[in-house]
């Protein structure tokens, strides 16, 4: 009996029915649950991959933009330095030109003053000679108590000029 009860517990029709139920349940679950869940997981995985790829692209673009901006900044700094250097050079050249011009003008003024001094000296010498000849004539006429003729005055002027040329 014990064997019969064991057989009753193990009934072939129940076993087959249970297997069929399991297969039907598996098919229904596969169709209704496993495929949508698998598709959902695959879609989610694809979205995550896409988001990661987009993030990588954006990071690369950001690095590229950063490099471009740094290059532009460096170029701007270089241009600024070049402009400053050019302005300094131009200022130095202008200052040099102004100094040269001032030196030329000073030399011109000094040269003109020297020429004027020489002319004044010559003028003073002529005036002194004329005055000396006049004084000598007056002194000689007082000594001789008479007025010298014009020819004698010319002779005295010649003597004074010769004496003056010896002192030059």
From Swiss-Prot:
UniProt membrane topology term: Single-pass membrane protein
Database matches in Gene3D superfamilies: 6.10.250.1580
Transmembrane segments: 9-29
Localization per record: Cell membrane
SUPFAM superfamilies reported for this sequence: F1F0 ATP synthase subunit B, membrane domain
Domain of life according to the entry: Bacteria
InterPro entries: ATP_synth_B-like_membr_sf, ATP_synth_b/b'su_bac/chlpt, ATP_synth_F0_bsu_bac, ATP_synthase_B_chain
Gene Ontology molecular function: proton-transporting ATP synthase activity, rotational mechanism; proton-transporting ATPase activity, rotational mechanism
Any Pfam family: ATP-synt_B
GO cellular component, one term: proton-transporting ATP synthase complex
Keywords, comma-separated and alphabetical: ATP synthesis, Cell membrane, CF(0), Hydrogen ion transport, Ion transport, Membrane, Transmembrane, Transmembrane helix, Transport
UniProt similarity note: Belongs to the ATPase B chain family.
Cited NCBIfam families: ATP_synt_b
Role summary: F(1)F(0) ATP synthase produces ATP from ADP in the presence of a proton or sodium gradient. F-type ATPases consist of two structural domains, F(1) containing the extramembraneous catalytic core and F(0) containing the membrane proton channel, linked together by a central stalk and a peripheral stalk. During catalysis, ATP synthesis in the catalytic domain of F(1) is coupled via a rotary mechanism of the central stalk subunits to proton translocation. Component of the F(0) channel, it forms part of the peripheral stalk, linking F(1) to F(0).
Quaternary structure and partners: F-type ATPases have 2 components, F(1) - the catalytic core - and F(0) - the membrane proton channel. F(1) has five subunits: alpha(3), beta(3), gamma(1), delta(1), epsilon(1). F(0) has three main subunits: a(1), b(2) and c(10-14). The alpha and beta chains form an alternating ring which encloses part of the gamma chain. F(1) is attached to F(0) by a central stalk formed by the gamma and epsilon chains, while a peripheral stalk is formed by the delta and b chains.
Protein name: ATP synthase subunit b
């Amino acid at each position: 009996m014990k064997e019969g009860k064991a057989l009753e517990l193990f009934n072939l029709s129940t076993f087959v029915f249970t297997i069929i139920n399991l297969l039907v349940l598996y098919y229904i679950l596969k169709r209704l649950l496993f495929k949508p869940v698998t598709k959902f997981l695959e879609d989610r995985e694809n979205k995550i991959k896409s988001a990661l790829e987009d993030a990588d692209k954006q990071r690369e673009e950001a690095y590229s933009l950063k490099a471009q901006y740094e290059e532009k900044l460096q170029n701007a700094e270089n241009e600024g330095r070049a402009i400053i250097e050019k302005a300094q050079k131009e200022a130095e050249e202008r200052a040099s030109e102004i100094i040269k011009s001032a030196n030329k003008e000073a030399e011109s003024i000094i040269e003109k003053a020297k020429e004027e001094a020489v002319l004044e000296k010559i003028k003073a010498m002529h005036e002194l000679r004329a005055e000396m000849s006049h004084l000598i004539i007056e002194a000689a006429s007082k000594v001789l108590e008479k007025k010298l003729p014009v020819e004698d005055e010319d002779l005295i002027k010649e003597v004074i000029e010769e004496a003056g040329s010896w002192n030059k």
